[in-house]
Amino acid sequence: MGQKVNPVGLRVGVIRDWESRWFAEKDYATLLHEDIKIREYITARLKDSSVSKVEIERAANRVNVTIHTAKPGMVIGKGGTEVEALRKALNQLTGKRVHINILEVKKADLDAKLVAENIARQLENRVSFRRAQKQVIQRAMRAGAKGIKTQVSGRLGGADIARAESYSEGTVPLHTLRADIDYATAEADTTYGKLGVKVWIYRGEVLPSKKKASEEGGK
């Protein structure tokens, strides 16, 4: 049986950039675990703030954290109180100077992580898995997606035997490396156990030649 590689990992270095950007020789493992801790802390603390991804850059004893979120107001807080509290907590967690940038995700319906989390939350609120999937597919296509595929697996509707059901619309060319495909997973805790959610969103092709040409033209 053909297995699917993670579409994001497959495209790193081709059309996508790394989410952790730093270099280390001796402390690689320590810093990697620190990255994982930072991400886990941020996602747990901001679980209601629609956080899509967390990018980390390092320089000497300084850590730059960029949070991509659909609700920047919630992350920043009134007069920047929330983001300041988060920065202090991360300073304590890492023992380093942490600087936080916040970027807004303009189209939440085209972000696989936010779509997957949305389906998971609906499943936890006892919405039918079919309805939840069809609803996000419609919204993604309206928002300008070229294609989308969603899958929910587990004890669907409380069935005794676990299974997976998926729905798709448009095209999702997983083999085309220049295709900008966003992929993410989420989990829903229901009374019958956990349900797994997977989302693939095809947002169009990225043409590296055009990108390079525009960069050279801008110099």
Swiss-Prot record:
GO molecular function: mRNA binding; rRNA binding; structural constituent of ribosome
Function: Binds the lower part of the 30S subunit head. Binds mRNA in the 70S ribosome, positioning it for translation.
Highest taxon listed in the record's lineage: Bacteria
Phylogenetic placement of the source organism: Bacteria, Bacillati, Bacillota, Bacilli, Bacillales
Family: Belongs to the universal ribosomal protein uS3 family.
InterPro entries: KH_dom, KH_dom-like_a/b, KH_dom_type_2, KH_sf_prok-type, Ribosomal_S3_C_sf, Ribosomal_uS3_bac-typ, Ribosomal_uS3_C, Ribosomal_uS3_CS
Any one cellular-component term (Gene Ontology): cytosolic small ribosomal subunit
Subunit (UniProt): Part of the 30S ribosomal subunit. Forms a tight complex with proteins S10 and S14.
Boundaries of every KH type-2 domain copy: 38-106
Protein keywords: Ribonucleoprotein, Ribosomal protein, RNA-binding, rRNA-binding
Keyword match Ribonucleoprotein: yes
Mitochondrion in keyword set: no
Record's protein name: Small ribosomal subunit protein uS3
Any one GO biological process: translation
Pfam families: KH_2, Ribosomal_S3_C
CDD domains with a match to the protein in the record: KH-II_30S_S3
NCBIfam families: rpsC_bact
PANTHER family the UniProt entry points to: 30S/40S RIBOSOMAL PROTEIN S3, SMALL RIBOSOMAL SUBUNIT PROTEIN US3C
